[in-house]
UniProtKB/Swiss-Prot annotation:
<feature type="binding site">
    <location>
        <position position="112"/>
    </location>
    <ligand>
        <name>Zn(2+) 2</name>
    </ligand>
</feature>
<feature type="binding site">
    <location>
        <position position="224"/>
    </location>
    <ligand>
        <name>NAD(+)</name>
    </ligand>
</feature>
<keyword id="KW-0862">Zinc</keyword>
<feature type="binding site">
    <location>
        <position position="68"/>
    </location>
    <ligand>
        <name>Zn(2+) 1</name>
    </ligand>
</feature>
<keyword id="KW-0520">NAD</keyword>
<comment type="function">
    <text>Alcohol dehydrogenase. Oxidizes primary as well as secondary alcohols. Ethanol is a very poor substrate.</text>
</comment>
<dbReference type="Pfam" id="PF00107">
    <property type="entry name" value="ADH_zinc_N"/>
</dbReference>
<comment type="subunit">
    <text>Dimer of identical or heterodimer of closely related subunits alpha, beta, or gamma that are encoded by genes ADH1A, ADH1B, and ADH1C, respectively.</text>
</comment>
<dbReference type="InterPro" id="IPR011032">
    <property type="entry name" value="GroES-like_sf"/>
</dbReference>
<dbReference type="GO" id="GO:1990362">
    <property type="term" value="F:butanol dehydrogenase (NAD+) activity"/>
</dbReference>
<dbReference type="GO" id="GO:0004745">
    <property type="term" value="F:all-trans-retinol dehydrogenase (NAD+) activity"/>
</dbReference>
<feature type="modified residue" description="N-acetylserine">
    <location>
        <position position="2"/>
    </location>
</feature>
<keyword id="KW-0007">Acetylation</keyword>
<dbReference type="GO" id="GO:0042572">
    <property type="term" value="P:retinol metabolic process"/>
</dbReference>
<feature type="binding site">
    <location>
        <position position="104"/>
    </location>
    <ligand>
        <name>Zn(2+) 2</name>
    </ligand>
</feature>
<dbReference type="InterPro" id="IPR013154">
    <property type="entry name" value="ADH-like_N"/>
</dbReference>
<feature type="binding site">
    <location>
        <position position="175"/>
    </location>
    <ligand>
        <name>Zn(2+) 1</name>
    </ligand>
</feature>
Length: 375
C-alpha cells in the first residue's frame, strides 16, 4: 500500500536538550511539498558535527533531529521534482546546490546560499518543518535530518547515485569522506612531492590523509593525542605519526624542525582554536597553505598576527571539501564503485539505529572512527 501523499509515523532520534542522550521517539513525517523529496533512510554515519550540536559548541534550534551523513531510497516526491523518482538510491546533501545563486554559479565555491549553516533556522527552505512529535514541531538539521527512518529534503539537497552502490558504505560520501578528501585535492590542491600535516585522525582526518596520498604528497605527518589511531593512519597513507604530548615544545615547532622550516600543506580536522593556530604556524611562512576543516566552536574568535600571512602563507577553509554537492557526490560514488578509493577502513562499528547513544559513546571514547547506524 502506497504511503505517497500521506503522513508517515516512524522512529527518530530526537535531541530535546543539550548534553543529554537522544530519545528514540515516534514522529510524524509530513508528505513532501512541491520540489521536495521524502526519503526512507537506510544507513547513517555518526559525525563529529552532530556531536558539536549535542555539546552546545554548534548552535541550532531545539528540539531537533540531527544526522547529515546518510544514504537512502526515495519514498515519494512532491510536485515539480525532476531529478529523482521513487525507488532511486540517494544521498541527502547537507550543503545544497540550487544552481541559481551567485555561489553556485561561481566555479570556485560550493557554499550555496540555500544552506542552513550560516544562520541555522532548523527548517526546510520554505521556513517550515515536516516533523511533529508529541504534537510539537521538531526542527530540521542542515535541511536533511537523517537520524530518522524517514526524512523530507528540498530537491536541491539530494543527489541520485548508482543503483548498485552499497548504502552502508557510500553514506560516508555525504559528509566525512568528501570533507576530508576534498580538503586536500580541491581546497589545498596538494601537489606531488609535497609535505603535509594532518591534525586529528577521526574519519575526516583520515580521509584528508587519503586525499593527500592521492594527490601525490611525499610526506604525510599525522598528528593526534590518541596513539591507537596511528596504525590506521599509516594504513591509509601517513608516513609518520606524532603525539603532541610526547614533546615539551609546541607541536608547531616540532613540525617545523621535522620539515626544514614548515610543511607545504596543513589541515586542522578537530575544530579547536588552539590546533587551528598550531596548524597555521606549522606550515612554511613563505609558501605554506593551511586549511580549516574542523567545525570551530560557535561565537569564539582567534587572535593572530597579520605578519603570519604577509610573508606568504595562505589560510583558508571550506565546507564539504569544496565539492559542489549535487553534481560531485554522484561522481564520487561512481569513483568508489570503480574502486578508485575504499571506505572500509573508515568504518569501525555498525549498529542498529536504536543504539545511537551507544554510537556516540564510542565517538566520545575515541574507540570509533565511523559508526554506521542501520535502519
Amino acid at each position: 500500500m502506497s504511503t505517497a501523499g500521506k503522513v508517515i509515523k516512524c522512529k527518530a532520534a530526537v535531541l530535546w536538550e543539550l548534553k543529554k542522550p537522544f530519545s528514540i521517539e515516534e514522529v510524524e513525517v509530513a508528505p513532501p511539498k512541491a520540489h521536495e523529496v521524502r526519503i526512507k533512510m537506510v544507513a547513517v554515519g555518526i559525525c563529529g558535527t552532530d556531536d558539536h550540536v549535542v555539546s552546545g559548541t554548534m548552535v541550532t534550534p531545539l528540539p531537533v533531529i540531527l544526522g547529515h551523513e546518510a544514504a537512502g531510497i526515495v519514498e515519494s516526491v512532491g510536485e515539480g521534482v525532476t531529478t529523482v523518482k521513487p525507488g532511486d538510491k540517494v544521498i541527502p546533501l547537507a550543503i545544497p546546490q540550487c544552481g541559481k545563486c551567485r555561489i553556485c554559479k561561481n566555479p570556485e565555491s560550493n557554499y550555496c546560499l540555500k544552506n542552513d549553516v550560516s544562520n541555522p533556522q532548523g527548517t526546510l527552505q520554505d521556513g517550515t518543518s515536516r516533523f511533529t512529535c508529541r504534537r510539537k514541531p521538531i526542527h530540521h538539521f542542515l535541511g536533511i535530518s537523517t537520524f530518522s527512518q524517514y526524512t523530507v529534503v528540498d530537491e536541491n539537497a539530494v543527489a541520485k547515485i548508482d543503483a548498485a552502490s552499497p548504502l552502508e558504505k557510500v553514506c560516508l560520501i555525504g559528509c566525512g569522506f568528501s570533507t576530508g578528501y576534498g580538503s586536500a585535492v580541491n581546497v589545498a590542491k596538494v601537489t606531488p612531492g609535497s609535505t603535509c600535516a594532518v591534525f586529528g585522525l577521526g574519519g575526516v582526518g583520515l580521509s584528508a590523509i587519503m586525499g593527500c596520498k592521492a594527490a601525490g604528497a611525499a610526506r604525510i605527518i599525522a598528528v593526534d593525542i590518541n596513539k591507537d589511531k596511528f596504525a590506521k593512519a599509516k594504513e591509509l597513507g601517513a608516513t609518520e605519526c606524532i603525539n603532541p604530548q610526547d614533546y615539551k615544545k609546541p607541536i608547531q615547532e616540532v613540525l617545523k624542525e621535522m620539515t626544514d622550516g614548515g610543511v607545504d600543506f596543513s589541515f586542522e580536522v578537530i575544530g579547536r582554536l588552539d590546533t587551528m593556530m598550531a596548524s597555521l604556524l606549522c606550515c612554511h611562512e613563505a609558501c605554506g597553505t593551511s586549511v580549516i576543516v574542523g567545525v570551530p566552536p560557535d561565537s569564539q574568535n582567534l587572535s593572530m598576527n597579520p605578519m603570519l600571512l604577509l610573508t606568504g602563507r595562505t589560510w583558508k577553509g571550506a565546507i564539504l571539501g569544496g565539492f559542489k554537492s549535487k553534481e560531485c557526490v554522484p561522481k564520487l560514488v561512481a569513483d568508489f564503485m570503480a574502486k578508485k578509493f575504499s571506505l572500509d577502513a573508515l568504518i569501525t562499528h555498525v549498529l542498529p539505529f536504536e543504539k545511537i547513544n551507544e554510537g556516540f559513546d564510542l565517538l566520545h571514547s575515541g574507540k570509533s572512527i565511523r559508526t554506521i547506524l542501520m535502519f
